[in-house]
Curated annotation (Swiss-Prot):
This is Small ribosomal subunit protein uS9. GO terms for cellular component: cytosolic small ribosomal subunit. It comes from the Bacteria. GO terms for biological process: translation. It comes from Vibrio atlanticus (strain LGP32). Belongs to the universal ribosomal protein uS9 family. PROSITE patterns: RIBOSOMAL_S9 (PS00360). Transmembrane segments: none annotated.
Length: 130
């Protein structure tokens, strides 16, 4: 382990990401694959890069990320949250900018559970008058 390595944990929906940041050339490795290989959708790649672009450190830091659980969108959100936390550990003066952009807050929205007697979480069975 490098001595100048910073860590952040991010969560979103049912995904959890562990993010390690160290000074480097801007390489992003997710589960031993590059960002472009891991996320095919451009929107997911954009979500992951948002905190780095905000603080203009895209080319100065290397990121090593492990993420598990959930789907593509949840994993991208978890990685963004983890990167934000690691950046705050790296430099506490970045916190106000990240907070203003809304990246520090954990997005608490998750799937609502299915209820007994209903078809889905809120979808009721079809009503027949006769």
């Amino acid at each position: 382990m490098a001595e100048n390595q910073y860590y952040g944990t991010g969560r979103r929906k049912s995904s959890a990401a562990r993010v390690f940041i160290k000074p480097g050339s801007g390489e992003i490795v997710i589960n031993k694959r590059s960002l472009d290989v891991y996320f095919g959708r451009p929107t997911s790649r954009m979500v992951v890069k948002q905190p780095l672009e905000l603080v203009e450190l895209t080319e100065k830091l290397d990121l090593y990320i492990t993420v598990s659980g959930g789907g593509i969108s949840g994993q991208a959100g978890a990685i963004r949250h983890g990167i934000t936390r690691a950046l705050m550990e790296y430099d506490e003066t970045l916190r106000p900018a990240l907070r203003a952009a809304g990246y520090v807050t954990r997005d608490a929205r998750c799937v609502e559970r299915k209820k007994v007697g209903l078809r889905k979480a809120r979808r009721k069975p079809q009503f027949s008058k006769r």
